[in-house]
UniProtKB/Swiss-Prot annotation:
Site residues, Stabilizes the phosphate intermediate: N72
SUPFAM superfamilies associated with the record: P-loop containing nucleoside triphosphate hydrolases
Binding of GTP, residues: G13, A14, G15, K16, S17, T18, S173, K174, L175, D176
UniProt-recorded name of the protein: GPN-loop GTPase 3
Keyword terms: GTP-binding, Hydrolase, Nucleotide-binding
Role noted for this protein: Small GTPase required for proper nuclear import of RNA polymerase II and III (RNAPII and RNAPIII). May act at an RNAP assembly step prior to nuclear import.
Species of the source: Kluyveromyces lactis (strain ATCC 8585 / CBS 2359 / DSM 70799 / NBRC 1267 / NRRL Y-1140 / WM37)
Length: 271
């Protein structure tokens, strides 16, 4: 039977850990089991304990102290060490066959753009451990209200989609931070926007020599058709449930479930 896993991606501060906690809490409330796999060697404490934690293998703090490396260099060292010890990950995952594994990933984009760390882990999970995977990419709602920043975030999300080669769901987090009525109205156009129309706004704010570049970026985003975002309100069960339904669909979670045995406690007379 295939296993199901969700990679949670996005820049630092996008609300990845909050999203993981919201998904875990919601799944527990509906009787489904899930576990968080922490792949961030610099992670801080969260509401829910990590079932599997890369820091049990290697931590950013230890690498920085021992080798005198900076944060980014230490992060890359940690993941190269993990790639050389994937048997540890296999052993930790063990027999989690019928439960969701939610992989909370670091925010550094270079782990899949500059060096093939996350793509290698993805291929290993798929080929060696028989995982059905999808990637979720989070961007902060207050961040994308700025049209230029929207294109920046969309390109980052598209990089993850192309390089990881996984079913992909884009999410706008921290909707509660958008309080101004004007910004709330503006935000709606970014949930399913037309990039070509948004270039007019960008062109108004940039030097004319960048207009062709702006239009080229808009065309690129539009051609890949990845500009739709799902809104996330982490404290709203309906919002979390909607996103989980999308994840279930792309990972084919229902198809991976074994048929339930009839309840032999039910007597014929009770039916």
């Amino acid at each position: 039977m295939s296993r199901v896993g969700v990679l949670v991606l996005g820049p630092a501060g996008a609300g990845k850990s909050t999203f993981c906690n919201a998904i875990i809490s919601h799944m527990q409330s509906i009787g489904r089991r899930a576990h968080i796999v922490n792949l961030d060697p610099a992670a801080e404490a969260t509401k829910y304990e990590f079932t599997i934690d890369i820091r049990d293998l290697i931590s950013l703090e230890d690498v920085m102290e021992e080798f005198g490396l900076g944060p980014n260099g230490s992060l890359i060292y940690c993941f190269e060490y993990l790639l050389n010890n994937l048997d540890w990950l296999d052993e930790e995952i063990g027999d989690y066959n019928d439960e969701y594994l939610i992989f909370d990933c670091p925010g550094q984009i270079e782990l899949y753009t500059h060096i093939p760390v996350l793509p290698t882990i993805v291929r290993h999970l798929q080929n060696q451990l028989n995982f059905n995977l999808c990637a979720t990419y989070l961007l902060e709602a207050p961040f994308v209200i700025d049209t230029s920043k929207f294109f920046s975030g969309a390109l980052s999300a598209m990089s993850a989609m192309i390089l990881l080669e996984l079913p992909h769901i884009n999410i706008l987090s921290k909707l509660d931070l958008v309080k101004d009525s004007h910004n709330k109205k503006a935000l709606k156009k970014f949930l399913n926007p037309d990039p070509l129309l948004l270039t007019d706004k960008v062109n108004e704010e940039t030097n004319p020599k960048f207009h062709k570049l702006n239009e080229a970026i808009a065309n690129l985003v539009d051609d890949f058709g990845m500009v739709q975002f799902l809104p996330l309100e982490a404290k709203n069960p309906e919002s979390v449930s909607t996103i989980l339904s999308y994840i279930d669909d792309v990972t084919q979670w229902a198809e991976a479930q074994e048929p339930k045995e009839p309840n032999d406690q039910i007597e014929i007379d009770d039916m």
